[in-house]
Amino acid sequence: MFVRHLTLTDFRSWARADLELEPGRTVFVGPNGFGKTNLVEALWYSATLGSHRVASDAPLIRVGAPRAVVSTIVVNEGRELAVDLEITTGRANKARLNRSPVRSPREVLGVLRAVLFAPEDLALVRGDPGERRRYLDELATTRRPSIAGVRADYDRVIRQRTALLKSAAGARYRGDRSVLETLDVWDGHLAAHGALLMAARADLVHHLAPEVEKAYQLLAPGSRPAAIRYRTSIDAEDDVSAEYYEAALLDAMTRRRDAELERGVCLVGPHRDDLELRLGDQMAKGYASHGESWSMALSLRLAAYELLRTDGSDPVLLLDDVFAELDAARRRALAEVAASAEQVLVTAAVAEDIPADWDARRIMIRMQDDDDGRVSMVES
């Protein structure tokens, strides 16, 4: 799989970008702040419908523009697919597949499969559980695009149930049973949708764990072994069925009903889960050194890459300024993986950040002041 063409309109610092890409290695070179990361971010957005840098879409639209458009042409086993994503503030985003509108942008998920390495990856180890849940859900969705719908349904249920919990607390003291009966209905919705999401995550971690262990040994031979485990907010065994999770969620919500009403928040469900990262007998978060944290973060991405490769065609590798963050051993390990990928798209502040033996096409990025303000440009 590779991206043959990338077009941007009013995306971040790019008023317009029109790039012909090819298999192999391509390096976008330019000083920090010139917009090279925005190119990688656009490709990641096309693959996942999300940014690796911000939680909302609004910052992706260039200042003063009404919308941003990301268009890609992806080639997979000789077949071309064109994806257009239109990002608009305050309105639902739109998508087209082969120039035809689709009902939801989620319908284009799976066209571009990618794995991103970025400086932000350190948050996978040192950040809060939400970072690790997002990693799992993005990877699960890349493997099975239908998971995006499961996650969207679950998020909707959480919003509705949280609002109901806030109002139900007062209703209980007024003796209003109708609100509590409605809460029972939403308990069922949370259990049904949450169980599907938890089962998908557990299945993913089951397949991911041996790949993480192997990747960490590659990056840090002789170090403590790395291990991962899906830790839920309920008492559940590893790698169980959706039916088991559904029953366990219903039981947990019954037991924690008073606490949820008192606090007005959902205390049970996959939004409270975590991906446990361990080095030897210690948790990586709080105990891993800076180098060990980087090795663990890279191991999670390398494992994702290997898992997607076993599913089918090679995913596109996106390397956002990571070589500058790594020591020599980790640079070599990452370069070895990149050597076998069908397409690698890399950003670097200076050409010296790229391995010296790489045969790579280089695209220089600059900034220019014009009628659109300060915008990113490709040097001709």
UniProtKB/Swiss-Prot annotation:
KW Metal-binding (keyword) present: no
UniProt keyword annotation of RNA-binding present: no
Cellular component terms (Gene Ontology): cytoplasm
GO terms of biological process kind: DNA replication; DNA synthesis involved in DNA repair; double-strand break repair; SOS response
SUPFAM superfamilies: P-loop containing nucleoside triphosphate hydrolases
Molecular-function annotations in GO: ATP binding; single-stranded DNA binding
Domain of life where this protein originates: Bacteria
Stretches of the chain forming a coiled coil according to its record: none
Keywords, alphabetical: ATP-binding, Cytoplasm, DNA damage, DNA repair, DNA replication, DNA-binding, Nucleotide-binding, SOS response
InterPro entries: DNA-binding_RecF, DNA-binding_RecF_CS, P-loop_NTPase, RecF/RecN/SMC_N, RecF_2
Compartments reported by the entry: Cytoplasm
Primary location class: cytoplasm
Ligand binding (ATP): 30-37
CDD domains linked to this entry: ABC_RecF
Family from the record: Belongs to the RecF family.
Protein function: The RecF protein is involved in DNA metabolism; it is required for DNA replication and normal SOS inducibility. RecF binds preferentially to single-stranded, linear DNA. It also seems to bind ATP.
Protein's name according to its UniProt entry: DNA replication and repair protein RecF
Organism in which the protein naturally occurs: Mycobacterium sp. (strain KMS)
Gene this chain is encoded by: recF
